[in-house]
Amino acid sequence: MEKEDKDLRLDDWDEENIEEVVILPSSRHPAAPPMDLEKYRQRVERYSERLRQRESVTVITTDLEELLFEAEQRTLQYDYYNALGIYAIVLDERLKERNATLIRLLDHSMDEVIPDLATLLSEASSSLGYDSNVTPLLSKEERQHWLTRLVTFWLKRLDNREIEEDLSEILLDMIWQEDIPILVEMVTNELQRLRKGKSSTIVDLNQQYRLRVLERFLKELPYTKQE
Protein backbone atom coordinates (compact mmCIF):
# COMPACT_ATOMS: atom_id res chain seq x y z
CA MET A 1 0.00 0.00 0.00
CA GLU A 2 1.43 3.35 -1.02
CA LYS A 3 1.88 5.98 1.62
CA GLU A 4 -0.58 8.83 1.18
CA ASP A 5 0.75 12.34 0.68
CA LYS A 6 -0.82 13.46 3.91
CA ASP A 7 0.18 11.64 7.08
CA LEU A 8 -2.73 10.22 9.03
CA ARG A 9 -2.22 11.83 12.41
CA LEU A 10 -4.60 12.48 15.26
CA ASP A 11 -4.44 16.25 14.75
CA ASP A 12 -4.97 16.06 10.98
CA TRP A 13 -8.70 15.38 11.09
CA ASP A 14 -10.71 17.79 8.97
CA GLU A 15 -13.51 17.74 6.44
CA GLU A 16 -11.08 17.00 3.60
CA ASN A 17 -10.67 13.52 5.07
CA ILE A 18 -14.42 12.89 4.88
CA GLU A 19 -16.25 11.35 1.95
CA GLU A 20 -19.85 10.21 1.82
CA VAL A 21 -20.30 6.55 2.60
CA VAL A 22 -21.81 4.56 -0.25
CA ILE A 23 -22.93 1.00 0.40
CA LEU A 24 -23.80 -1.38 -2.39
CA PRO A 25 -27.30 -2.91 -2.17
CA SER A 26 -28.12 -6.61 -2.13
CA SER A 27 -30.93 -8.24 -4.09
CA ARG A 28 -32.81 -8.97 -0.86
CA HIS A 29 -32.52 -5.45 0.49
CA PRO A 30 -32.47 -2.90 -2.34
CA ALA A 31 -30.84 0.42 -1.55
CA ALA A 32 -33.12 3.15 -0.24
CA PRO A 33 -32.93 6.47 -2.07
CA PRO A 34 -30.20 8.71 -0.62
CA MET A 35 -31.27 11.54 1.65
CA ASP A 36 -30.01 15.08 1.49
CA LEU A 37 -27.28 14.47 4.07
CA GLU A 38 -26.05 18.04 3.73
CA LYS A 39 -29.14 19.22 5.59
CA TYR A 40 -28.28 16.83 8.40
CA ARG A 41 -24.70 18.07 8.43
CA GLN A 42 -25.84 21.69 8.70
CA ARG A 43 -28.25 20.73 11.48
CA VAL A 44 -25.45 19.17 13.54
CA GLU A 45 -22.96 21.93 12.76
CA ARG A 46 -25.39 24.48 14.23
CA TYR A 47 -25.21 22.85 17.66
CA SER A 48 -22.06 24.75 18.61
CA GLU A 49 -23.54 28.12 17.66
CA ARG A 50 -26.77 27.32 19.48
CA LEU A 51 -24.79 26.59 22.63
CA ARG A 52 -22.90 29.88 22.29
CA GLN A 53 -26.27 31.59 22.13
CA ARG A 54 -27.11 29.90 25.45
CA GLU A 55 -29.78 27.61 24.07
CA SER A 56 -30.73 24.84 26.46
CA VAL A 57 -28.41 21.85 26.41
CA THR A 58 -31.48 19.68 26.99
CA VAL A 59 -33.09 20.89 23.77
CA ILE A 60 -29.94 20.18 21.75
CA THR A 61 -29.52 16.79 23.42
CA THR A 62 -33.08 15.86 22.47
CA ASP A 63 -32.45 16.84 18.86
CA LEU A 64 -29.27 14.78 18.75
CA GLU A 65 -31.00 11.77 20.29
CA GLU A 66 -33.73 12.00 17.65
CA LEU A 67 -31.09 12.09 14.94
CA LEU A 68 -29.31 9.01 16.26
CA PHE A 69 -32.61 7.21 16.73
CA GLU A 70 -33.34 7.85 13.06
CA ALA A 71 -29.98 6.28 12.17
CA GLU A 72 -30.89 3.23 14.26
CA GLN A 73 -34.28 2.89 12.56
CA ARG A 74 -32.76 3.23 9.10
CA THR A 75 -30.32 0.45 9.96
CA LEU A 76 -33.20 -1.83 10.93
CA GLN A 77 -34.82 -1.02 7.57
CA TYR A 78 -31.58 -1.94 5.72
CA ASP A 79 -31.07 1.69 4.76
CA TYR A 80 -27.35 1.40 5.48
CA TYR A 81 -26.27 4.27 3.22
CA ASN A 82 -28.24 6.89 5.10
CA ALA A 83 -27.71 5.36 8.54
CA LEU A 84 -23.94 5.44 8.14
CA GLY A 85 -24.19 8.95 6.72
CA ILE A 86 -25.90 10.19 9.88
CA TYR A 87 -23.40 8.48 12.18
CA ALA A 88 -20.53 9.92 10.14
CA ILE A 89 -21.89 13.46 10.43
CA VAL A 90 -22.17 13.20 14.22
CA LEU A 91 -18.70 11.69 14.60
CA ASP A 92 -17.14 14.28 12.31
CA GLU A 93 -18.65 17.07 14.39
CA ARG A 94 -17.22 15.46 17.54
CA LEU A 95 -13.75 15.33 16.01
CA LYS A 96 -13.80 19.05 15.21
CA GLU A 97 -13.92 19.82 18.97
CA ARG A 98 -15.63 23.19 18.61
CA ASN A 99 -17.02 23.43 22.13
CA ALA A 100 -16.27 21.64 25.41
CA THR A 101 -19.95 21.26 26.30
CA LEU A 102 -20.72 19.91 22.85
CA ILE A 103 -17.83 17.44 23.08
CA ARG A 104 -19.28 15.99 26.29
CA LEU A 105 -22.75 15.87 24.75
CA LEU A 106 -21.56 14.13 21.59
CA ASP A 107 -19.38 11.69 23.51
CA HIS A 108 -22.26 10.67 25.75
CA SER A 109 -24.66 10.25 22.84
CA MET A 110 -22.17 8.30 20.71
CA ASP A 111 -21.32 6.04 23.65
CA GLU A 112 -24.98 5.05 23.78
CA VAL A 113 -25.08 3.99 20.13
CA ILE A 114 -21.66 2.33 19.82
CA PRO A 115 -23.20 -1.20 19.86
CA ASP A 116 -25.53 -0.27 16.98
CA LEU A 117 -22.72 1.34 15.02
CA ALA A 118 -20.51 -1.69 15.65
CA THR A 119 -23.12 -4.04 14.18
CA LEU A 120 -23.70 -1.80 11.18
CA LEU A 121 -20.01 -1.43 10.37
CA SER A 122 -19.41 -5.14 10.83
CA GLU A 123 -22.18 -5.89 8.33
CA ALA A 124 -20.94 -3.23 5.92
CA SER A 125 -17.35 -4.50 6.03
CA SER A 126 -18.27 -8.14 5.44
CA SER A 127 -20.00 -10.09 2.69
CA LEU A 128 -21.60 -12.61 5.06
CA GLY A 129 -25.29 -13.00 4.39
CA TYR A 130 -25.20 -11.11 1.10
CA ASP A 131 -24.87 -11.97 -2.57
CA SER A 132 -21.41 -13.24 -3.43
CA ASN A 133 -21.11 -10.69 -6.23
CA VAL A 134 -21.48 -7.82 -3.76
CA THR A 135 -18.33 -8.19 -1.67
CA PRO A 136 -17.91 -6.31 0.57
CA LEU A 137 -20.70 -3.76 1.03
CA LEU A 138 -18.13 -1.07 1.84
CA SER A 139 -15.47 -0.59 -0.79
CA LYS A 140 -11.84 -0.52 0.26
CA GLU A 141 -11.74 3.29 0.11
CA GLU A 142 -14.98 3.71 2.05
CA ARG A 143 -13.92 1.22 4.71
CA GLN A 144 -10.57 2.95 5.16
CA HIS A 145 -12.24 6.35 5.54
CA TRP A 146 -14.37 4.87 8.31
CA LEU A 147 -11.34 3.27 9.96
CA THR A 148 -9.50 6.59 9.93
CA ARG A 149 -12.51 8.31 11.47
CA LEU A 150 -12.88 5.66 14.18
CA VAL A 151 -9.17 5.50 15.06
CA THR A 152 -9.16 9.27 15.51
CA PHE A 153 -12.18 9.04 17.82
CA TRP A 154 -10.66 6.08 19.68
CA LEU A 155 -7.41 7.92 20.33
CA LYS A 156 -9.37 10.76 21.88
CA ARG A 157 -11.24 8.35 24.16
CA LEU A 158 -8.40 6.20 25.51
CA ASP A 159 -9.04 7.32 29.09
CA ASN A 160 -12.54 5.84 29.03
CA ARG A 161 -11.67 2.18 29.40
CA GLU A 162 -15.07 0.72 28.56
CA ILE A 163 -15.51 2.81 25.40
CA GLU A 164 -11.87 2.33 24.44
CA GLU A 165 -12.35 -1.43 24.47
CA ASP A 166 -15.57 -1.22 22.46
CA LEU A 167 -13.95 0.96 19.81
CA SER A 168 -10.84 -1.19 19.52
CA GLU A 169 -13.07 -4.25 19.02
CA ILE A 170 -14.90 -2.47 16.19
CA LEU A 171 -11.60 -1.63 14.52
CA LEU A 172 -10.29 -5.17 14.79
CA ASP A 173 -13.57 -6.55 13.47
CA MET A 174 -13.63 -4.20 10.46
CA ILE A 175 -10.05 -4.34 9.22
CA TRP A 176 -8.81 -6.28 6.25
CA GLN A 177 -5.17 -7.12 5.72
CA GLU A 178 -4.73 -4.17 3.37
CA ASP A 179 -5.94 -1.74 6.08
CA ILE A 180 -3.25 -2.61 8.60
CA PRO A 181 -0.65 -0.03 7.42
CA ILE A 182 -3.13 2.80 8.00
CA LEU A 183 -3.84 1.74 11.57
CA VAL A 184 -0.18 1.07 12.31
CA GLU A 185 0.78 4.54 11.12
CA MET A 186 -1.88 6.33 13.16
CA VAL A 187 -1.24 4.37 16.36
CA THR A 188 2.54 4.62 16.00
CA ASN A 189 2.31 8.39 15.55
CA GLU A 190 0.29 8.66 18.76
CA LEU A 191 2.73 6.42 20.63
CA GLN A 192 5.62 8.63 19.55
CA ARG A 193 3.74 11.74 20.66
CA LEU A 194 3.03 10.27 24.10
CA ARG A 195 6.60 9.07 24.59
CA LYS A 196 8.00 12.49 23.73
CA GLY A 197 5.84 14.05 26.42
CA LYS A 198 6.73 11.44 29.03
CA SER A 199 8.35 12.87 32.14
CA SER A 200 11.48 11.20 33.50
CA THR A 201 10.62 12.16 37.08
CA ILE A 202 6.82 12.22 37.38
CA VAL A 203 4.78 9.03 37.08
CA ASP A 204 1.65 9.66 35.00
CA LEU A 205 -0.59 6.63 35.43
CA ASN A 206 -3.03 7.76 32.75
CA GLN A 207 -0.23 8.16 30.26
CA GLN A 208 1.18 4.76 31.16
CA TYR A 209 -2.26 3.25 30.60
CA ARG A 210 -2.57 4.91 27.16
CA LEU A 211 0.84 3.61 26.16
CA ARG A 212 -0.06 0.06 27.20
CA VAL A 213 -3.36 0.21 25.31
CA LEU A 214 -1.68 1.37 22.10
CA GLU A 215 1.14 -1.15 22.37
CA ARG A 216 -1.36 -3.96 22.97
CA PHE A 217 -3.44 -2.87 20.00
CA LEU A 218 -0.45 -3.01 17.66
CA LYS A 219 0.26 -6.56 18.81
CA GLU A 220 -3.33 -7.55 18.01
CA LEU A 221 -3.27 -6.13 14.49
CA PRO A 222 -1.97 -9.08 12.42
CA TYR A 223 -5.23 -10.18 10.87
CA THR A 224 -6.29 -13.00 8.62
CA LYS A 225 -9.28 -11.58 6.76
CA GLN A 226 -8.51 -11.80 3.06
CA GLU A 227 -10.15 -10.42 -0.06
Which role fits each region the language model picked out?
Residues 1-227:
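Eukaryote-biased, non-catalytic alpha-solenoid scaffold regions
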